[in-house]
């Protein structure tokens, strides 16, 4: 049986990856890479990871920075929120980006591995993870309540060929802290339950009913 060291890490806001001075950004990146190096995981699931196009038209991506620094052989980025698709509401971020010479900012989840990914339906062949929506609001309003949510679904190309999940479930305004609202707490629990039910439905026929192994990582925004 293969032994794996797994790690999950929320970077605390894709926006923050590209705000502040260049010295601040370098310090954040160094701290993240140092933490990952200390753990040295075989599998790493990251939430709220960001990338953008710089002034010269080059892709500036935390996914690439982590992959290269930690020497991961395989990486996949799944976008959940983007400047071009959603920022017509949160236009302060768009304007800040335009006049600081970066564009096409997006954030999402990422999966890193030292083992190849396989196809979901054929573990003998290498494949590409899938980025699957589990919550898509009719209108994005620039708030966490309407943040789109996706799950990355993949599989490892090594016995026993476990399926991999990287998810980031919803958290609602008003559900935390001393001033938390009871209605918000209950609505948040219901929303996360619905998202988990969608994931279970996604896996039920081809994974769960066959009792195949699953490794589920992510930020569940919930108490154990």
Task: Please place each PLM-identified region on the residue numbering.
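Conserved beta strand-loop-helix elements of the APE1-like EEP
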Residues: 68-70, 100-121, 156-157
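Metal-dependent phosphoesterases centered on the DNase I-like endonuclease/exonuclease/phosphatase
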Residues: 65, 172-224
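Active-site-proximal beta-strand elements of phosphoester/diester hydrolases
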Residues: 3-19, 121-126, 153, 161-171
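N-terminal, active-site-proximal structural segment of metallo-dependent hydrolase catalytic domains
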Residues: 1-106, 196-200
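Acidic/histidine-rich helix-loop elements
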Residues: 8-29, 51, 134-139, 143, ...
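Glycine-rich phosphate-binding loop signature in dinucleotide/nucleotide-binding domains
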Residues: 38-39, 158-159, 206-212
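Active-site flanking residues adjacent to catalytic metal/cofactor-binding acidic residues
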Residues: 9, 46-47, 167, 217-219
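Active-site catalytic loop in hydrolytic enzyme cores
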Residues: 115-161
């Amino acid at each position: 049986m293969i032994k794996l060291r797994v790690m999950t890490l929320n970077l605390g806001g894709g926006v923050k990856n590209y705000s502040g001075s260049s010295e601040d950004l370098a310090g954040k990146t160094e701290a993240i890479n140092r933490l990952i190096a200390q753990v040295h995981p075989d599998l790493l699931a990251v939430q709220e990871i960001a990338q953008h196009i710089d002034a010269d038209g080059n892709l500036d991506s935390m996914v690439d920075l982590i992959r290269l620094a930690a020497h991961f052989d395989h990486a996949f980025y799944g976008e959940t929120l983007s400047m071009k698709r959603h920022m017509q509401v949160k236009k302060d971020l768009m304007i800040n980006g335009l006049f600081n010479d970066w564009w096409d900012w997006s954030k999402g989840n990422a999966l890193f591995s030292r083992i190849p990914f396989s196809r979901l339906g054929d573990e003998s062949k290498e494949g590409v993870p899938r980025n699957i929506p589990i919550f898509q609001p009719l209108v994005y309003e620039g708030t966490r309540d309407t943040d789109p949510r996706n799950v990355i679904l993949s599989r490892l190309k090594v016995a026993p060929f476990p399926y991999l999940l990287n998810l980031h479930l919803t958290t609602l305004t008003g559900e935390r802290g001393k001033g938390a609202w009871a209605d918000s707490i209950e609505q948040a629990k219901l929303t996360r339950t619905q998202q988990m039910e969608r994931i279970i439905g996604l896996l039920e026929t081809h994974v769960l009913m066959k009792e195949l192994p699953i490794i589920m990582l992510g930020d569940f925004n919930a108490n154990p």
